[in-house]
Amino acid sequence: DVMSYGLDTKVETIGRKIAGKIPPLGHQAYNIAVVPVMMQPLRYKVNVELDCVDENGNPYKFHRENMEYALFAICNASYYGGGFCPAPGSKLDDGLLDFTYVDPLSLAKAVPIVPRYSAGTAAEYAPDVVHTGYTVGGRFWSVDDRPLLGNCDGENFDYTEVRFKVEKH
């Protein structure tokens, strides 16, 4: 399960259209969709508040208003889309959601990161722009009261605010 905003949501939207028109492409449609999306500015804005946990289990808050980003993914799985891997160490049963966000970047900086994002090694390759962590809940909300285009498990949504949390059963 992955909820995402930004670049990857746009890739998913275009990839689904390509796959609908050319079904034999299958998941390769998402790899093809990366090209037109990368030709657009890779800069979006959102307000974010996350209840996070560091690697030692200590809680902390991640709060940014008017945050600029290229991609933001909240993950309870390692892979999504056409095999992209934003959270290589994600575990379904650990009570945590992994998150990955990428700062705004130029096309020249983005091009070498994309295959590494697909392989799950982007954070190691570009730690100055690819950031990761763990969360148990939080919210995303619009900076201008317009709906945010997001995606959850292949389904697009557009809300001005989204809240989420991990519930143990």
Q: What do these predicted regions represent?
A:
Residues 1-169:
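Long C-terminal subdomains/extensions of small-metabolite kinases
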